[in-house]
């Protein structure tokens, strides 16, 4: 039902401030789920089981991090038919993020710009929300995305990632290390060759210790930017192979603006998502696939606004895909549309 109603609701939602509309929509989904109306929320998605990183995914279409930063809407979002859900980014301590306004629509380009800045309630509150979710209890695949606090010096970023990894590990199907948001100062420096090598080495050591402690191996994946040249992609590929990382998510938002030049809000600071990042994301996926082969699975995200776009990511070398901005423009029916495209 919601699939049919979304085109009617979108003009109302787009008349609101983007961040207000975001919270309004999530709260309405949560209310509908609490009232037992889950069957009216999303379309049925036929099972397409596949095993990636040792995890059994019921279908290959997931929710990207950023939509539910605090893990407060997991069960309602799970009713939309996703094969997996990723929540966060969470940091060790609560932080407000950047001042509002910090999210902007570019409808002519089916795009968003955000400079949220990892606003979240901190890892302890995050874990309480995750523990309360029935999705996790029922065996749903749940990725937990971790980052660093804005006031943590980049030289000590590893401390924040270690703290979050240790806290979320028992509750995660997999953990994503986000080093690619453009909205935390200097964060993307961690994609540099020496910085990345040091970070991944430390996190892999902690992962093995936690696996021994909890008697359960939780994959750790890296989320990277689309704004990388061939040498940078090669360096990242080498690091992923050298440290035997479990997976990589390609990609985060872009800081490039050529595709939206002249549009209202195009010059706002922040990360650009949606249609304009589609080709850049797919380029990174294709390049990584050539470097990694089958050794490191790729999760493709960026500019998926139709089933054929999800198919592009898989054809370029991704094993799974994630959605975010496409949901804003197309509504929840996009989940089933992408799943159908990947079943063909």
From Swiss-Prot:
Native organism taxonomy: Bacteria, Pseudomonadati, Pseudomonadota, Betaproteobacteria, Burkholderiales
Cofactor(s) recorded in Swiss-Prot or TrEMBL: FMN
Known pathway: Pyrimidine metabolism; UMP biosynthesis via de novo pathway; orotate from (S)-dihydroorotate (quinone route): step 1/1
List of residues binding FMN: 65-69, 89, 145, 178, 223, 251, 274, 303, 324-325
Binding site for substrate: 69, 114-118, 178, 183, 252-253
EC supergroup of this enzyme: oxidoreductase
Protein known as: Dihydroorotate dehydrogenase (quinone)
One of the record's GO cellular component terms: cytoplasm
Cystine pairings recorded for this chain: none
EC number(s) given by UniProt: 1.3.5.2
Protein's membrane topology: Peripheral membrane protein
Record-stated family: Belongs to the dihydroorotate dehydrogenase family. Type 2 subfamily.
One example GO MF annotation: dihydroorotate dehydrogenase (quinone) activity
UniProt keywords, alphabetically: Cell membrane, Flavoprotein, FMN, Membrane, Oxidoreductase, Pyrimidine biosynthesis
GO-annotated biological processes: 'de novo' pyrimidine nucleobase biosynthetic process; 'de novo' UMP biosynthetic process
Catalytic activity as recorded in UniProt: (S)-dihydroorotate + a quinone = orotate + a quinol
PANTHER family hit by this protein: DIHYDROOROTATE DEHYDROGENASE (QUINONE), MITOCHONDRIAL (PTHR48109:SF4), DIHYDROOROTATE DEHYDROGENASE (QUINONE), MITOCHONDRIAL-RELATED (PTHR48109)
Purpose: Catalyzes the conversion of dihydroorotate to orotate with quinone as electron acceptor.
Active-site residues from the entry: 181 (nucleophile)
Record bears the keyword Nucleus: no
Originating organism: Ralstonia nicotianae (strain ATCC BAA-1114 / GMI1000)
Subcellular location: Cell membrane
Cofactor note as given: Binds 1 FMN per subunit.
A Pfam family assignment: DHO_dh
């Amino acid at each position: 039902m919601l699939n049919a109603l979304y085109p009617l609701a979108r003009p109302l939602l787009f008349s609101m401030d983007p961040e207000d509309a975001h919270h309004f929509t999530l709260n309405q989904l949560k209310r509908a789920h609490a009232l037992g109306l889950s069957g009216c929320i999303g379309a049925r998605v036929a099972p397409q089981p596949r095993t990636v990183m040792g995890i059994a995914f019921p279908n290959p279409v997931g929710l990207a991090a950023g939509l539910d930063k605090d893990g407060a809407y997991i069960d309602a979002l799970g009713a939309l038919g996703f094969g997996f859900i990723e929540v966060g980014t969470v940091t060790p301590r609560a932080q407000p993020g950047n001042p509002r306004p910090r999210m902007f629509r570019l409808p002519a380009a089916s795009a968003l710009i955000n400079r949220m800045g990892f606003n979240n309630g901190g890892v302890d509150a995050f874990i309480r929300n995750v523990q309360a979710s029935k999705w996790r209890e029922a065996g749903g695949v749940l990725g937990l995305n971790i980052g660093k606090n804005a006031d943590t010096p980049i030289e000590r970023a590893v401390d924040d990632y270690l703290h979050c990894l240790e806290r979320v590990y028992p509750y995660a199907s997999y953990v994503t290390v986000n080093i690619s948001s453009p909205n935390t100062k200097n964060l993307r420096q961690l994609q540099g060759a020496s910085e990345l090598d040091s970070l991944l080495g430390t996190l892999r050591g902690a992962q093995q210790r936690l696996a021994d402690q909890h008697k359960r191996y939780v994959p750790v994946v890296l989320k990277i930017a689309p704004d990388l040249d061939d040498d940078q992609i090669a360096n990242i590929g080498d690091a992923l192979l050298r440290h035997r990382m479990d997976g990589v998510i390609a990609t985060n938002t872009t800081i490039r603006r050529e595709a939206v030049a002249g549009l209202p809000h195009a010059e706002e600071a922040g990360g650009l998502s949606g249609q304009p990042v589609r080709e850049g994301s797919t380029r990174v996926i294709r390049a990584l696939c050539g470097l990694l082969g089958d050794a490191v699975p790729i999760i493709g995200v960026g500019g998926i606004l139709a089933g054929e776009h999800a198919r592009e990511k898989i054809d370029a070398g991704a094993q799974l895909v994630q959605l975010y901005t496409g949901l804003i423009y197309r509504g929840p029916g996009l989940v089933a549309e992408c799943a159908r495209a990947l079943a063909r």
